Design a protein with these regions (language model features):
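Positively charged, Gly/Ser-enriched RNA/tRNA-binding surfaces
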Residues: 1-59, 105-326
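Acidic, His- and aromatic-enriched active-site or binding-groove loops in soluble protein domains
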Residues: 79-107, 193-195
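Short, well-ordered alpha-helical microsegments
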Residues: 71-72
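Ligand-site clamp/hinge motif
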Residues: 64
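Juxtamembrane helix-loop transition sites at the ends of transmembrane segments
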Residues: 49, 78, 85, 100, ...
Length: 326
């Protein structure tokens, strides 16, 4: 599979409010298969979420997991296959608008009967431990093939999540999770900070089998998540979990060649990199003062100077940019 991640700015047309912005940074992580993609990947994605959030020093978060095949299958049992998309988008608003308003939309906008709306609300209200929710879902099994497939996949994801070392207090089977975008086809996720419910989801995603089909005539099933970094860092900053001592410079050291031939400087930079440090090599033929001005702008902690004398002696000069010591 093709495994990729990126961090970039994204834009969304929504009302700006606490923790929600129209322009923000987002991290995307995806695994794309060629023709098929094993269910194991649908557990690895939330396992990555767990490790990232624990790495940030967060513990009070919950990865809520569901499978859209279960929802589609259940709606089919009620004779509502043609309205499943509208129903899912409505159910996805449950946390924001509450059960009463969801029921009203199901009745007035989706055209459901009272019995159908009540049946859906009872279904998504199934709660308990992961084992208890899965056991309750077994009571619906055998009536719809898609439902049964989704239940089988959800069971596999929960088993594999435990194998990845994700504790149950950090993930929960939650039948209210639907994701409003129609391209999701299987497992779906939403991650919330339990001590900041007003922020909403800070990380979400799911399985998408047919998304590439909008662009190319080839099956490229995938699964992925997006982390709202700006929203998340807003909370981390409030809680004092952002470490200002972490390096902000793009490199640990800047190597400044002081000769016309860069060969020795290139070799030195590679040697330092092999030791696990981040190194930037200055390649412009400029005056020493301009080179040091660049180093100051870069805010690197160390500058490595390599001139003719250093090359001849097999040494280099290192300047501590904070103290000025060399």
């Amino acid at each position: 599979p093709f495994r990729r991640y990126q961090i970039s700015k994204v834009y969304r047309g929504e009302r700006a409010q606490r923790g929600r912005f129209r322009e923000f940074y987002q991290a995307d992580i995806d695994i794309i298969g060629d023709g098929k993609l094993d269910i194991l990947n649908e557990a690895e994605i939330p396992a990555i979420i767990y490790k990232v959030f624990r790495g940030f020093g967060l513990s009070w978060f919950q990865i809520r997991v569901n499978n859209r095949k279960i929802l589609n299958g259940f709606y089919a049992m009620l004779g509502l296959s043609e309205k499943s998309g509208d129903i899912m988008r409505t159910v996805d608003k449950l946390d924001k608008i509450g059960a009463d308003k969801v029921r009203l939309i199901l009745l007035e906008d989706c055209g459901l009967t009272d019995d159908q709306a009540d049946e859906i609300l009872r279904f998504i209200a199934i709660t308990g431990s992961n084992a208890q929710v899965l056991s309750a879902l077994e009571g619906y099994a055998g009536r719809n093939e898609m439902f049964d497939q989704g239940l089988s996949e959800l069971k596999a994801v929960t088993v594999n999540l435990a194998a990845f070392g994700v504790p149950e207090e950090n993930f929960a089977v939650d039948l209210t999770i639907a994701r409003g975008l129609d391209y999701y086809t299987g497992t779906v996720y939403e991650t919330t900070l339990l001590d900041h419910p007003e922020i909403g989801s800070v990380c979400s995603g799911g399985r998408y089998d047919n998304l590439a089909g909008y662009y190319i005539d080839k099956a490229l099933p995938g699964v992925g998540i997006s982390i709202g970094l700006t929203r998340l860092f807003y909370v981390l900053d409030e809680q004092g979990l952002l470490n200002p001592a972490l390096p902000s410079a793009p490199a640990d050291a800047l190597v400044l060649p002081m000769t016309d031939s860069p060969a020795a400087a290139i070799a030195l930079a590679e040697t330092i990199r092999s030791a696990g440090l981040r190194v930037q090599l200055y390649g412009e033929q400029k005056k020493f003062k301009q080179k040091m001005a660049y180093a100051n702008k870069l805010e690197v902690p160390f500058v490595v100077l390599l001139g003719e004398d250093e090359i001849a002696e097999g040494v280099c000069s290192v300047k501590n940019m904070a103290t000025g010591e060399q």
